């Protein structure tokens, strides 16, 4: 199954309404057969025209919380038309993974020797209503600087559907294009640059009389848009990437969501802490206990840190040769059953548990051998079957069978999921064979020798691994070291026939992909991908060119990351088994922390953890935004995955046990405590309400709610202490 390079195109309808008329009536343009949507209230479609609400309305959002809209979670609208994708394949020998396409040709040139472009179009996949992730809520309430006015949608483009643009850099580009279009209207000039105003997509422009009120209105709106863009550009820190703007924004929004979640209940607070500690790259101060004299003496006797721990001497090659290798790479008495399961090798949701049962608990070796045969990678890279099986068995033996989740079963599942994602119609002919080899290999080794505890546990316990890797992606660095070290074992070098350049490039790609499985890097990965996709959406071409290493590895990193977080997108039967396993591993870590007298990590205390609520939060704040962004890249290929994800989320939501009402005396104590807790914040609010805050005299406070205990004064004597109403009004947190 060789892969070759491609240019992907989808043709869009050219039925575009008059831009000027639309700008007066709606302050944004609409194209083709799109549906009218109140975009700034949180509804969007999978693809289509990029929309921008009036600036005045965006500014007014600063005084309105997301809850004020009465919409708890944005949703999409059902659309009916499927996009048509035309793939033009090109010889992959013409493409250099690191250097990109041959010079001198545009990637869109039909005679170009190579490049891949994902063209986002104005035709849409049909799907049922589906909730949107928190990324599409307004971020206005989180911004304090007058230069940080945020918007939650984008402006018109004739090449896309009604997508909301949420990444800051793409919003700036979209706004500048709006300014340019308005300028052509105000001056009655027609642009001549094909790059910025393709003739095919240029909307008809009406002549405007400078004396008309509409002219003055449009001029003022244009000036305000330009001022907004300048304010945004002035705040950009030049030493940081533009995608970091999106990463910081998403982190602010997630922190806001987690604050609300933590205030709802004790279990909600635990889920909030787990998500924050695991998926946000927080540089927390860590108390590392000082080693005792006995510990120091013990460490002197330990092996040098330059040696890679966890590598065992195993012999699998003595009994292997090309004639003795079985059909699926493993010895089994259930070959027919195994063959039946592997019929789903190219499908999303293969039952890896059955594969493990029929392969004598060799799921990784079995799956990898099947994938390499399916893709003809053994022949392409001249890998002998016995060398491949020897390496895979050695690798699988370095996964710990006593670890409930991060074992060879999980590695096999991620490898198979990556294999399917690589075969997605939108990406099927995009990546080279070397990139495919690197992605599948990275998935196979990404958790090897996992001890069943988190990076933070290793850091907190002053482990050798944490010291070796300076607390940075400790386990991920270790997985890479072990995975590559095993290639040096006898009869294990599956890359021996690669050229020096191929080997160096593969190693570089594998390192990038495995390091991306560090969950603390999740928000940065998400922001990078979303910024890349949305930036291309607002350009005149609307083409996502994968013609350089940075863009290509960015897609591959997110692909492996998606595969690593794919459990909630599988069938409920499989998802529940994975959930049971990860919770068992969490609880085992919690027991170790309890034995050591350490603070138990969130979701690791088997006595207090809420499994159902943790899965709902995991989907809402981590999995859904990631897969939603991936679906934007490869649409409509991921629609079924999103549907399954929503079904699973709803099932776990329905299984959350209803908490009983607390005793009345506890309510009284809570109310009294709340009055004492929020008295200071109420005083600040009253002071703020007396007038505008003076420059340089701002207050810093943390309360996100005002809580009042109300007692009817006329019936105070006749009421017991339990007759108390608690009125709560949500307020936005203020960070300084």
UniProtKB/Swiss-Prot annotation:
Keywords: cAMP, Cell membrane, Cytoplasm, Hydrolase, Membrane, Metal-binding, Phosphoprotein, Zinc. It catalyses: 3',5'-cyclic AMP + H2O = AMP + H(+). The keyword Metal-binding applies. GO terms for cellular component: centrosome; cytosol; dendritic spine; excitatory synapse; gamma-tubulin complex; postsynaptic density; synaptic vesicle; voltage-gated calcium channel complex. It is an enzyme of class 3 (hydrolase). Binds 2 divalent metal cations per subunit. Site 1 may preferentially bind zinc ions. The modification Phosphoserine is found at residues 290, 659, 661. Inhibited by rolipram. 3',5'-cyclic AMP binds at residues 406, 615, 618. The keyword Hydrolase applies. Residues 330-659 form the PDEase domain. One of its GO terms (molecular function) is cAMP binding. Expressed in brain, heart, lung and skeletal muscle. Expressed in white blood cells. It comes from the Eukaryota. It holds the Pfam family PDE4_UCR. SMART domains: HDc. AMP binds at residues 406, 410, 447, 564, 615, 618. Zn(2+) 1 binds at residues 410, 446-447, 564. Its cofactor is Zn(2+); Mg(2+); Mn(2+). Its EC number is 3.1.4.53. The active site is at residue 406. Hydrolyzes the second messenger cAMP, which is a key regulator of many important physiological processes. May be involved in mediating central nervous system effects of therapeutic agents ranging from antidepressants to antiasthmatic and anti-inflammatory agents. Belongs to the cyclic nucleotide phosphodiesterase family. PDE4 subfamily. This is 3',5'-cyclic-AMP phosphodiesterase 4B.
């Amino acid at each position: 199954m060789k892969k070759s390079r491609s240019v992907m195109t989808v043709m869009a309808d050219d039925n575009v309404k008059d831009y000027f008329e639309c700008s007066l009536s709606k302050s944004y343009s609409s194209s083709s057969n799109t549906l009218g949507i109140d975009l700034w209230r949180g509804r969007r479609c999978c693809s289509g025209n990029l929309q921008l609400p009036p600036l005045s309305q965006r500014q007014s959002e600063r005084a309105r919380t997301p809850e004020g809209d009465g919409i708890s979670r944005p949703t999409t609208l059902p659309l009916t038309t499927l996009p048509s994708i035309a793939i033009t394949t090109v010889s992959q020998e013409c493409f250099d993974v690191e250097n990109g396409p041959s010079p001198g040709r545009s990637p869109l040139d039909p005679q170009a020797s190579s490049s891949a472009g994902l063209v986002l179009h104005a035709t849409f996949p049909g799907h049922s209503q589906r909730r949107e992730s928190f990324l599409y809520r307004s971020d206005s309430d989180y911004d304090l600087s007058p230069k940080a006015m945020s918007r939650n949608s984008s402006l018109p483009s004739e090449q896309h559907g009604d997508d909301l643009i949420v990444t800051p850099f793409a919003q700036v580009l979209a706004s500048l294009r709006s300014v340019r279009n308005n300028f052509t209207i105000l001056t009655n000039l027609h642009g001549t640059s094909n790059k910025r105003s393709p003739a095919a997509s240029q909307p008809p422009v009406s002549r405007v009389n400078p004396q008309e009120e509409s002219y003055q209105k449009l001029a003022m709106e244009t000036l305000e848009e330009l001022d907004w863009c300048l304010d945004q550009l002035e705040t950009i820190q030049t030493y940081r990437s533009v995608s970091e703007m999106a990463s910081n924004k998403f982190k602010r929004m997630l922190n806001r969501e987690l604050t609300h979640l933590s205030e709802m209940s004790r279990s909600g607070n635990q889920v909030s802490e787990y998500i924050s500690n695991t998926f946000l790259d927080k540089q927390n101060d860590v108390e590392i206990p000082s080693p005792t004299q006995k510990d120091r003496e013990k460490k002197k006797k330990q092996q040098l840190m330059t040696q890679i721990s966890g590598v065992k001497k195993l012999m699998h090659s003595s009994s292997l040769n090309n004639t003795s290798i079985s059909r699926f790479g493993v010895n089994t008495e259930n070959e027919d059953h195994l063959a039946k399961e592997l019929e789903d090798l190219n499908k999303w949701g293969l039952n890896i548990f059955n594969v493990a049962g029929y392969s004598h608990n060799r799921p990784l070796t079995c799956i990898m051998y099947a994938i390499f045969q399916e893709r003809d990678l053994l022949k392409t890279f001249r890998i002998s079957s016995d060398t491949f099986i020897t390496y895979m068995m050695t690798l699988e033996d370095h996964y710990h069978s006593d670890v409930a989740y991060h074992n060879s079963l999980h590695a096999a599942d991620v490898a198979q999921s990556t294999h399917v994602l690589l075969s997605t119609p939108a990406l099927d002919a995009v990546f080279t064979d070397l990139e495919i080899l690197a992605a599948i290999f990275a998935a196979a080794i990404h958790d090897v020798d996992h001890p069943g505890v988190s990076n933070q546990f290793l850091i907190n316990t002053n482990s050798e691994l944490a010291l070796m890797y300076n607390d940075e992606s400790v386990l991920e660095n270790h997985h890479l070291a072990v995975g590559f070290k095993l290639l040096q074992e006898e009869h294990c070098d599956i890359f021996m026939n690669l050229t020096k350049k191929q080997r160096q490039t593969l190693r570089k790609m594998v390192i990038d992909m495995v390091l991306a499985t560090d969950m603390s890097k999740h928000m940065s990965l998400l922001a990078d991908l979303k910024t890349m996709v949305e930036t291309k959406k607002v350009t005149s071409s609307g083409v996502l060119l994968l013609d350089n290493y940075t863009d290509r590895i960015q897609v591959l990193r997110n692909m492996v990351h998606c595969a690593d977080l794919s459990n909630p997108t599988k069938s409920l039967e499989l998802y529940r088994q994975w959930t049971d396993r990860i919770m068992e591993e969490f609880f085992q870590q919690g027991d170790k922390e309890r034995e050591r007298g350490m603070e138990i990590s969130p979701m690791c205390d088997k006595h207090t953890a809420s499994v159902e609520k943790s899965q709902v939060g995991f989907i809402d704040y981590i999995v859904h935004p990631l897969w939603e962004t991936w679906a934007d890249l490869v649409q409509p290929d991921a629609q079924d995955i999103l549907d399954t994800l929503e079904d699973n989320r709803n099932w776990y939501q329905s299984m959350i046990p209803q908490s009983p009402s607390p005793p009345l005396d506890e309510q009284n104590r809570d109310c009294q405590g709340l009055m004492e807790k929020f008295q200071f914040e109420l005083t600040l609010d009253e002071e703020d309400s007396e007038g505008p805050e003076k420059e340089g005299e701002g207050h810093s406070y943390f309360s996100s709610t005002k809580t009042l205990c109300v007692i009817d004064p006329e019936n105070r004597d006749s009421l017991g202490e339990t007759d108390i109403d608690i009125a709560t009004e949500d307020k936005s947190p203020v960070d300084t």
